[in-house]
Amino acid sequence: MAILTNTRSCVTVLAFLSLLFSFSIHAQNTIAPFQTWTDVVRTKPYAESQGVYDNVMTVRRWILTRSEHCTERNRHVLFDMRGNFLDFIEDASDSLQTQQKLNQTRQGMAQQGRVHAWVEGNANTIGYPFAIRCHQPYVDLSLAVSRYLGEHPDGRLSGNWNGISVGTPKNQASLHDVLQTVYKRRVQQKRISLPSNLLPDLAGMLIIESGGVREAKSKANARGILQLTPTALKDCGVPANKHLHRIAQVDCALWLFERNHRMLQPVFLARFGHLPEEKREQVYRLLLIQAYHGGPGRVRSLLTDEEFSKPAAYFAAHHEQFSAGDIAFGMVFHNLGRNRLGFASLYYTADIRIAQQMLASRNIANLASLQQSHLLTSL
């Protein structure tokens, strides 16, 4: 009888311990979500910005070129604070179910230890890990590059603007020709002091902003090939009946770049003047792109504001550990969610650089084709 009683006691104790262990495991696997995605951003060390530029570029390249994990349009890709790709999901039948699927995936990643935290997203709130849709209905990068180079009829033009003449009706110019002509003319007139190494950035903007479409208009009322607002065009002295004039748009964009350059260069050099020349130049170019997109005042605050400039101060002191892209992106990444800074600024900058790379590849291919043609002709 005593033996039976002892046996029952042991079984009871073992069952209790097993239940306790089960609760312990469940507690370890159930990770409560952060309240907001900005909590995740604020708790991550600046040092974890290493690699963010290349990682974001990779994800955006998949989207713009419809490649890798974005060959199917009805997908979302998820990535972490460093921009590392984590996974993708197939979209559900509607946006609400897709959001639920994203949140389940986020929670699962946290429970598996793939991310240190998760945040539930909804129609009004960004979730974490971050997610972006593969389908970008207004993007056709290859066609936009063709327009820029004048390979597509929509990209060819002739006309006059404020003392500048480009092309003729019988020998029309490309948008590339327009950019080069306007830049050279304004430099000769000493109206701008922009270094010529900024021209590839403007070329990227001509490709990305509107796809080279003259009549493009955004929901925010930005218009034309460089998506300039009526206010910006007025500041440039462009009359209302010339807002879509492509030469005028390029001229105005150069003026805006010049204005931003004059505003930002002194404070940039005060913060990053000690960087090696090539790295310093690359960081500055990326910040100028962000200034064109979000306004120079916002970028200036990243360099001078007591709170917003903390990431810049860290990267300036430890620049050897980061690429130029990591520094420029890190300054924005660690300020996301405040001062009206959002992912659009990072995506825009990445897209400009991707457009530049595609343009360079197209130019190389065209040159090789031309050389091959000359070789065959000479045989």
Regions flagged by a language model, labelled:
Residues 2-217, 231, 251, 255-281, ...:
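Cell-wall glycan-active module
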Residues 216-235:
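Short, surface-exposed glycine/acidic/tryptophan-bearing loops
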Residues 222, 244, 277-282:
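A glycine-rich, coil/turn loop motif that links secondary-structure elements
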Residues 237-241, 276-277:
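Short secondary-structure capping micro-motifs at structural edges
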Residues 239-249:
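A short, structured beta-strand-centered segment in the mid-to-C-terminal lobe
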Residues 285:
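Conserved glycosyltransferase catalytic-site signature
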